[in-house]
């Protein structure tokens, strides 16, 4: 078993583009006033993969599904997907990452790496 990283550091300009496409602060941080953990290098979006095949393991939803099926409740998904998501959560927490309750794929580590308040100006 291994990991596939979808997203880590994200420039503010990319955050602004995401916000423009999906302006919901529960799932996408505002590029100026939000927490912007990806812009600060304190967040990672990832999943589990089978190292032999390279295939992604079954998870509660696809990546960036912005609805309640993506949360960490897991009662509304396939039991295998729930078990895989719990494995990912357990491993990430073991290494100091905190899960975000609304997205099974999103983890932060703001304790080990203090947040840098300097940002590039948003584009557009």
Task: Give the ranges of each region predicted by the language model.
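Cell-envelope/glycan interface and biosynthesis
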Residues: 1-124
